[in-house]
């Protein structure tokens, strides 16, 4: 008997969020935009999830880390509910 192979599902097209918003430079003070790149637990989302380029991912990472230093965004592990 020959085994049947499953056909692979078509690859999901990743959308570049920064490009769709028309943002060229990421600013650490723009917390509403930065929150879109942070998970519910406060971790920075990966490129495979966000669809950013390498340079854009570096900008987002630097901006998020700076915003955390300035206490504009929470660090991962800090639970806002106090649990």
Curated annotation (Swiss-Prot):
Pfam name, any one: Ribosomal_S18
UniProt keywords, alphabetically: Ribonucleoprotein, Ribosomal protein, RNA-binding, rRNA-binding
MF terms (GO), sorted A to Z: small ribosomal subunit rRNA binding; structural constituent of ribosome
Record keyword rRNA-binding present: yes
Any single GO BP term: translation
UniProt GO cellular component terms: cytosolic small ribosomal subunit
InterPro entries: Ribosomal_bS18, Ribosomal_bS18_sf
Family: Belongs to the bacterial ribosomal protein bS18 family.
Function per UniProt: Binds as a heterodimer with protein bS6 to the central domain of the 16S rRNA, where it helps stabilize the platform of the 30S subunit.
Oligomer and partners: Part of the 30S ribosomal subunit. Forms a tight heterodimer with protein bS6.
Listed name of the protein: Small ribosomal subunit protein bS18A
Lineage: Bacteria, Bacillati, Actinomycetota, Actinomycetes, Mycobacteriales
């Amino acid at each position: 008997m020959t085994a049947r192979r499953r056909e692979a599902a078509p690859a999901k097209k990743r959308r570049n969020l920064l490009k769709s918003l028309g943002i060229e430079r990421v600013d650490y003070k723009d917390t509403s935009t930065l929150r879109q790149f942070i998970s519910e637990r406060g971790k920075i989302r990966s490129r495979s999830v966000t669809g950013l380029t390498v340079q854009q991912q570096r900008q987002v990472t630097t901006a998020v880390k700076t915003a955390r230093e300035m206490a504009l965004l929470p660090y991962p592990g800090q639970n806002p509910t106090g649990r």
